[in-house]
Regions:
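A phosphate-binding catalytic loop at a beta-strand-loop-alpha-helix junction
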Residues: 85-104
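Cysteine-based protein phosphatase catalytic domain of the PTP/DSP
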Residues: 1-87, 108-140, 146
Length: 151
């Protein structure tokens, strides 16, 4: 199973695809999943493991992504991480574009600078690739959507 831990509670990676892999996810202590892949919804696989899934599908098509996509993910992540003992796994099919993009939005919403968050993700997960249009999408979301509390 392709899981890269960025912090003690946030991981990024590739697709789950099977019950056996979902069992590995559960054994890793993951309680919440943001599934960015359009190809497959993890929700049915997670039911038996009491893992909450946000299926937030988007195509890896190198086009600008709307703020609503990031808002859904960030709100889910914030709600999940407010609870003690939770762990969040953000993934797409390969863990190269879409999952790192959403992870960037989540980390920045938690107060990380864009550059520091990108360095963390790329440092721990060298296959992560930040397409310019995806970084611009995250920046636009952060400029327009984050509230004045400076989250």
């Amino acid at each position: 199973m392709d899981i890269t831990w960025l912090t003690e509670r946030i991981a990024v990676g590739g697709g789950i695809w099977s019950t056996a892999n979902m069992e590995v996810v559960a054994q890793a202590g993951i309680t919440h999943i943001i599934d960015m892949q359009i190809e497959f919804d993890d929700t049915p696989l997670a039911v038996d493991y009491d893992i909450e899934v946000l299926w937030n599908p988007t195509d890896d098509d190198f086009t600008f992504k709307p703020a609503a996509l990031f808002r859904r993910g960030v709100e889910f992540a914030e709600a999940a991480l407010q609870k003690d003992g939770t762990k969040l796994f953000i993934h797409c099919a390969a863990g190269v574009h879409r999952a790192p993009m959403m992870t960037l939005a989540v980390l920045c919403s938690m107060g990380w600078s864009l550059n520091d968050a990108m360095e963390l993700i790329e440092g721990r997960r060298p296959v992560a690739d930040f397409a310019d249009v995806y970084v611009e999408s995250v920046e636009k979301f952060l400029e327009e959507e984050m509230d004045p509390r400076g989250r």
